[in-house]
């Protein structure tokens, strides 16, 4: 359905993280952190997410992009949602499209993405649904493998322990982009980043480079918390955990 067989590694970043590999990967197993960690409390940033658990070792979340924040006192218009989505693309992309009467911002933005990526890769993506195009769809396969098979968020994660220090780990981040059936392109050499290096050094990550900085900047503090906390275990929330 996602045609994973016809993907190629376009970007590969390997970063050393100042936290145990298991704790590092748990940071990417839920979407509840998005509102504060990634969005600074901005409107429309509440993650509308469903979680599924499959036996024996697979789970999935689907975070719908461009959905209404259920905690907002009043629902935004589709045009307001469209402006929020368009803001991701930057000023160089031109004026924000108008959402026609009866249409949704999600559907309009998905068509923009399919057209843009179709021109970039010289391929037809019209068969992709709005959800397949826009949404953050993550499958986790125990113990350390994640894949996002969507069109605009095409990531693969792998987390590995540091063999010399259990308080550090390695995070391999890949972007899998579409390729024509039968084509063969060698994968790029990984860009290796140390703990204090920014993901924005990788041009291939685009605007997501800054997002990954936000996702991992608090991990050293997490390790310190593990070492100093008097509790014997974790405290889990009753929502999205």
Residue ranges and their predicted role:
Residues 1-241:
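C-terminal catalytic domain of Rieske-type non-heme iron oxygenases
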